[in-house]
């Protein structure tokens, strides 16, 4: 029997995602819930994009993109929290600040990812969002995208 492309190139796409014009998804990718890809975004095969992510137009996704962030530039980099999307989905200001603090440690403390994960786990109160971010980083197969000022 013949197989369609969907059978050959498995893709998992979550609920309530918005893909603007000319967004392209390679095979074997995973995209979380409430993800927005602006126009002309290309997602490399085997990449994972977490929940509540916004990726700016014209971006090339080569690495995994952790939950709750905005990503842009070339190479694709962390540019902040998707605070507008999170507010629209009912996240409190306190919860958004907690998520921002996690990413400040990850991207601004000059720690490698393993050190940052250990620091966040030891110093920050457990929450579903904290645990989701840490699990995402631990499970990343391609590595997570860098911060804007980090070396690739």
Give names to the regions the model predicted.
Residues 4, 64, 90:
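Conserved functional loop/turn residues at catalytic and ligand-binding sites
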Residues 1-9:
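Single conserved hydrophobic/aromatic residue that forms the stacking wall/gate
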Residues 40, 58, 140-144:
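Short alpha-helical linear motifs
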Residues 9, 27, 45, 90, ...:
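Short coil/turn residues that cap or connect secondary-structure elements
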Residues 68, 74-152:
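Terminal amphipathic alpha-helical/low-complexity segments used for targeting or macromolecular assembly
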Residues 7, 13, 19-21, 25, ...:
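Hydrophobic face of beta-strands forming the core of extended beta-sheets/solenoids
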């Amino acid at each position: 029997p013949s197989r369609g492309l969907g059978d050959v190139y498995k893709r998992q796409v979550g609920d309530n995602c918005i893909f603007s014009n000319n967004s392209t998804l390679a095979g074997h990718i995973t995209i979380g819930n409430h993800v927005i890809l602006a126009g002309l975004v290309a997602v490399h095969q085997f990449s994972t994009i977490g929940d509540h992510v916004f990726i700016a137009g014209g971006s090339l996704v080569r690495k995994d993109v952790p939950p709750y962030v905005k990503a842009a530039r070339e190479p694709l980099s962390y540019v902040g929290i998707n605070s507008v999307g999170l507010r629209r989905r009912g996240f409190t200001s306190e919860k958004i600040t907690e998520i921002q603090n996690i990413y400040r440690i990850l991207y601004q403390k000059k720690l490698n990812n393993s050190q940052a994960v250990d620091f966040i786990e030891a110093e920050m109160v457990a929450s579903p969002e904290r645990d989701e971010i840490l699990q995402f980083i631990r499970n990343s197969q391609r590595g997570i995208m860098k911060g804007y000022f980090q070396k690739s």
